């Protein structure tokens, strides 16, 4: 059971949320008094409480979601809060629904979406994974961070062929290596205020690191927001090549590192927005005509469940008509379906852009 000091902090946080009339987070929407009373004294076997779940959203009232899972068990123990938030965010993934089993499908169904190279600047597919037997960031000890990093780096050092590469720990990294990784846009920084408030950045930079292959088309982040972020990317529009590389990497890593998986929610991640397939397939794409007709762009994006962001990701502008466009849906469909929906949408956008020229 949670101790008295934690419960007192929770009561205070709940009052703050209640008083914040302009707060629009899913946390505020679904943390009703009855849900709060039901969960405030619960504690996972690793010692995580409701405070670990909600503290980022309490501190940052401008959060969109406002909750994180401190460990895998939290998704079950605090389900009365997580389930409605998951249903709301992953439109229509109801509390009775079950995420399908992993299915990368026929990898040869994916193509180069822009063979002429006129529209797509680069293509990227990533997924997140958590290592079984370890909690998520807020509950990890310094020793666990080190242990996880050594497991990950030794697993990655066994990769062969085009996945073969080098692991760079953030601890003790030289300025030269750091600058090189920044120039390649590979280096991740210490978490933003949302992650800081969720206690996701403790013992930084212990246990954190970056692996990339020699061609710089395959990347693994160790202990950034999730235990593992596995990323495949390259210039141009060859989604097929990018997807096949990711699938072979995930399968290779999975042979050596067991991943946390939930019967109902799929692959588990620190943030509930990434659950399920955890897959985000995206392109940087130039659409000058559609950029001038934002309504049409949003209409097509809506039809194919695409998320349109500015050039540098969330909350940024499109520079020179370049957008970051990705699949929006991660839950209740297979990996294959998520990426296929994105491919169909991008092909349609390019077709319309050509017609408008």
Curated annotation (Swiss-Prot):
Q: Which residues carry this modification: N-acetylalanine?
A: 2
Domain annotation Phosphagen kinase N-terminal: ranges: 9-91
**EC top class named in words:** transferase
Superkingdom of origin: Eukaryota
Task: Give the GO cellular component terms, alphabetically.
Answer: extracellular space
Residues bound to L-arginine = 64-68, 225, 271, 314
E.C. no: 2.7.3.3
User: Record's Gene3D superfamilies?
Assistant: ATP:guanido phosphotransferase, N-terminal domain (1.10.135.10), Glutamine synthetase/guanido kinase, catalytic domain (3.30.590.10)
Q: Name one GO biological process term.
A: phosphocreatine biosynthetic process
Q: Does the keyword Isomerase apply?
A: no
Recorded protein name is Arginine kinase
What organism is the protein native to?
Callinectes sapidus
Its organism's taxonomic lineage begins at: Eukaryota, Metazoa, Ecdysozoa, Arthropoda, Crustacea
């Amino acid at each position: 059971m949670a101790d008295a000091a934690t419960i007192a902090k929770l009561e205070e946080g709940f009052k703050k949320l209640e008083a914040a009339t302009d707060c629009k987070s899913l946390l505020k929407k679904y943390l009703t008094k009855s849900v709060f009373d039901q969960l405030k004294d619960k504690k996972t076997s690793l010692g995580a409480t409701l405070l670990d779940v909600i503290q980022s959203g309490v501190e940052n009232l401008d959060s969109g979601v406002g909750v994180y899972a401190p460990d895998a068990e939290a998704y079950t123990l605090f389900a009365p809060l997580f389930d409605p938030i998951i249903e709301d965010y992953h439109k229509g993934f109801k509390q009775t629904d079950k995420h399908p089993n992993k299915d990368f499908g026929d990898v040869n169904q994916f193509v180069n979406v822009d063979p002429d190279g006129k529209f797509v600047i680069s293509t990227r597919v990533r997924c997140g994974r958590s290592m079984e037997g370890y909690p998520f960031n807020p509950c990890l000890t310094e020793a666990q961070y080190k242990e996880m990093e050594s497991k990950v780096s030794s697993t990655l050092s066994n990769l062969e062929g085009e996945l073969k590469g080098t692991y760079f720990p953030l601890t003790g990294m030289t300025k030269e290596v750091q600058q090189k990784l920044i120039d390649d846009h590979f280096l991740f920084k210490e978490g933003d205020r949302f992650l800081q408030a969720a206690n996701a950045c403790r013992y930084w930079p212990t246990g954190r690191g970056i692996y990339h292959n020699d061609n710089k088309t395959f990347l693994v982040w160790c202990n950034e927001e999730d235990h593992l972020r596995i990323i495949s990317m390259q210039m141009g529009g060859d989604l097929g090549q990018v997807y096949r590389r990711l699938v072979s990497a995930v399968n290779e890593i999975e042979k050596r590192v067991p991943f946390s998986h939930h019967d109902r929610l799929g692959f588990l991640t620190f943030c509930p927005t990434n659950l399920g397939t955890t897959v985000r397939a995206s392109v940087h794409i130039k659409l000058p005509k559609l950029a001038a007709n934002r309504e049409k762009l949003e209409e097509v994006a809506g039809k194919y469940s695409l998320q349109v962001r500015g050039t540098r990701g969330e909350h940024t502008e499109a520079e020179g008509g370049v957008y970051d466009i990705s699949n929006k849906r991660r839950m209740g469909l297979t990996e294959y379906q998520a990426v296929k929906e994105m491919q169909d949408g991008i092909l349609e956008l390019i077709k319309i852009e050509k017609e408008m020229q």
